[in-house]
Amino acid sequence: MIGESCKDIYHTGIVDRISSEAPVPIFKSEECFEKFGMAKNVHLNVLELNQECDIITNSDTHIRKERFIDKRFDSQVFRLDINDNCSPLDIDVLAYSNLSSYDAIIVSDYNKGFITAEVAEFISRSNDCIFVDSKKKDLSCYEGCFLKINEKEKSELTKPVDPKKLIVTSGKKGALYLENMYPAIQSEVFDVCGAGDVFIACLTTFYLHTNDIVKSIKLSNAFSSVSVRFSGNYIVNMNEVLNALQN
């Protein structure tokens, strides 16, 4: 697992009036809790699937995302991002990590500066089984890797990618692969935060066990469909998915 991590901080409370200083809401914070986000959220989801997983990441205290939630409506009032970028990963760290010895590599590239194009190219040459979730607009640095992006990210690509390696998630519709749409489980969407992390974690883990990308996509859809039922980053377990499939 390689990628940027952050600390997700959730403030829950209420908005009960508009400020007299400016036309903005006044938020009264009542509770605050933290979760790991981005690459560390992917990492935790892989571990939940009983798959061993090492991680190379930045300090999770550097990038922070603070969300302010009105508990009466379970709705986000606003989000505060602090330190929205980080220093590049040193290629020497990767060289010492013996990436070729791993069964697979997941790259969670939020395009915050940790994974430069040079670093991405190094990773791509280091293993034959690599799954990438990237917000870069030029994905040519990930040649030969499986790429998982969403519809918006696909529309912003500046260069074509190999369709045999491209999976496009489409929210409640499911995931598109080789012009086939694999549907998601119908589910009440409460919060999409972290759903992409769940998908890439499951996609990689199930592919290791099945060597079947289509079957892995279908299973990943199921897990992601469960994750959106909960607020914030959520670690999905197998029992929850089985219950969702039965219902």
Where are these regions (language model features)?
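Conserved phosphate-binding/catalytic region of the ribokinase-like
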Residues: 101, 118-129, 134-141, 156-247
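Conserved beta-alpha-beta core of the PfkB/ribokinase-like small-molecule kinase fold
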Residues: 18, 22, 68-83, 104-160, ...
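A secondary-structure boundary/capping signal
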Residues: 2-3, 150
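Active-site metal-binding loops of divalent metal-dependent hydrolases
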Residues: 4-5, 110, 198
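Catalytic cores of large soluble enzymes that bind and process phosphate-bearing ligands
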Residues: 31-34, 38, 111-115, 146, ...
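Conserved N-terminal subdomain of the carbohydrate kinase-like
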Residues: 7-104, 234-247
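Short beta-strand/turn micro-motifs composed of small residues
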Residues: 3, 47, 57, 134, ...
